Design a protein with these regions (language model features):
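Phosphate-group recognition and catalysis centered on beta-loop-alpha active-site segments
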Residues: 2-291
Length: 291
């Protein structure tokens, strides 16, 4: 998932998004502006729907190797990650591969679209950018099948964001590969049409609808109709939103957390899933104990 702030029109007008309710001043205090929450402000715990927060590592271990690469997934497995997220695209000849971007430009230095290339053509361009890229000279864009096999080797749960699967054959291939996972996969997507299609095809696992606006009653009704959970951008969710989702039987996934304090805030708020990136700080070992 790439975090890019894009101005959007909220579905319903309302207060500015916040991760915690605004503190109501008492007669003895002077009203103060709303501030970014800290672990000290959020004191009341709210449990996740299943009783435990699950942590999803974003695009593999990006501190060890380039994002969405086999070395990054293998490093995640060796570090004990339980859930690992990646992005899925269909090539021009119908093979499902792992890549966040629609082009090879950023990771491989080749300005060509994945959807217009064959799988064999894509494999001609190694990944040359990202963490420690020079240490992996033969690092290629993985196939979805390779990613699933890696998750199976390390007992990780696949978390798959569908970026682009254009054909019926591609969707059938996706369903087949999901069935090869030893763990129950989680599938996420911005497009509710794609998620509803998976339900039509018989996928009974967890589906998450990615949203970049505040939660609304209409959104909740759509989720209940197709048995979807919500994957919310961190800046557009509050503790009351999470409570409301839980009351409607919906789970909330938060993206994207890049430090321990932010992760701790949303854990206390009752988030069911937290999508995070590893960070190179001394607190990383402390955080690993909560995964």
């Amino acid at each position: 998932i790439e975090v890019i702030v894009i101005p959007t029109q909220p579905e319903n007008s309302g207060p500015e998004p916040s991760v915690t309710p605004e503190v109501t001043p008492t007669p003895e205090t002077t009203p103060t502006p709303e501030v970014t929450p800290t672990p000290e402000i959020i004191k009341d715990f709210q449990k996740p729907l299943d009783g435990v927060t699950r942590y999803i590592l974003h695009r593999g271990d990006q501190t060890a190797a380039p994002e969405n690469s086999m070395p990054a997934f293998e490093a995640a497995g060796r570090s004990g990650a339980e859930f690992v997220e990646t992005d899925v695209r269909e090539t021009g000849d119908g093979v499902l591969v792992v890549s966040h971007d629609d082009s090879l430009q950023r990771m491989c230095g080749e300005d060509r679209l994945i959807s217009e290339m064959t799988y064999d053509e894509i494999r001609q361009y190694p990944i040359i950018n990202g963490s420690n890229a020079s240490q992996y000279p033969d690092n290629l864009i993985p196939s979805l099948e390779e990613y699933i096999a890696c998750c199976n080797r390390y007992s990780m749960t696949p978390v798959l964001e569908i970026k682009s699967i254009r054909t019926e054959e591609g969707m059938a291939s996706f369903m087949k590969l999901l069935s090869q996972s030893k763990k129950d996969p989680v599938v996420i997507c911005f497009r509710i049409e794609t998620l509803s299609k998976l339900r039509e095809l018989g996928f009974g696992g967890r589906l998450q609808w990615i949203r970049t606006v505040r939660m609304t009653a209409s959104m909740i009704q759509h989720c209940k109709k197709y048995n979807l959970d919500i994957c919310s951008e961190y800046k557009n969710i509050s503790m009351n939103d999470i409570s409301n989702a839980h009351q409607n039987g919906l789970r909330i996934s938060i993206w994207l957390c890049r430090d321990k304090d932010m992760t701790d805030i949303f854990r206390k708020m009752g988030a069911d899933y937290i999508i995070y990136e590893k960070w190179l700080t001394d607190c990383e070992n402390d955080f690993s104990n909560t995964i």
